[in-house]
Amino acid sequence: MIRLANKDDLLSITQLVKEAKQIMEEFNNNQWDDEYPAKEHFEEDIENKTLYVLDVDHTIYGFIVIDQNQSEWYDDIDWPVNRNGAYVIHRLAGSKQYKGAATELFQFAIDLANEHDIHVILTDTFALNKPAQGLFEKFGFTKVDEIEIDYHPFDRGAPFYAYYKNI
């Protein structure tokens, strides 16, 4: 089941972050580093009730952050949709031990948007994060633009891609 995360989930979440970083390294993807995402990011997400986990028999196999906080660099993009009130997907990871975890979490985000009458979902990823790009395309997201960003955690030497989906 997918549910809101709580503080008891933090250890599992940080372990999933480590696993995700290892997978990213296999793709020469340096999107996540020692500072991002940090435990403090997830504590804030839990407090804001925006972090969801995929929990199967009390084991956490993935997480996703769904909120309405758009990165400031989104303002530099000419979006073909109205971004007001859009959901934004941040920090998504699924365990190698649960095939399809990221897909289930992404479908949950779309279902949550429908449930709350949200008509647009925005997200972004690093140019080297091919698995995320494939997931976005699988769900019918459209790539809008790519932006070079010069501040942490986005200063990675390659652009970030911005995506949207009308719901």
Question: What is the meaning of each model-derived region?
Answer:
Residues M1-Q15:
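A short beta-loop-alpha structural element at the N-terminal edge
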Residues K21-E43:
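Conserved GNAT-fold acetyl-CoA-binding loop/helix
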Residues V65-Q97, Y151-H152:
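Conserved acyl-donor/pantetheine-binding loop and adjacent beta-alpha core of acyl/acetyltransferases
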Residues R83, I149-I167:
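C-terminal "cap" of GNAT-fold acetyltransferases
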Residues K99-A113, G134-K138:
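Conserved acetyl-CoA-binding loop-helix of GNAT-fold acetyltransferases
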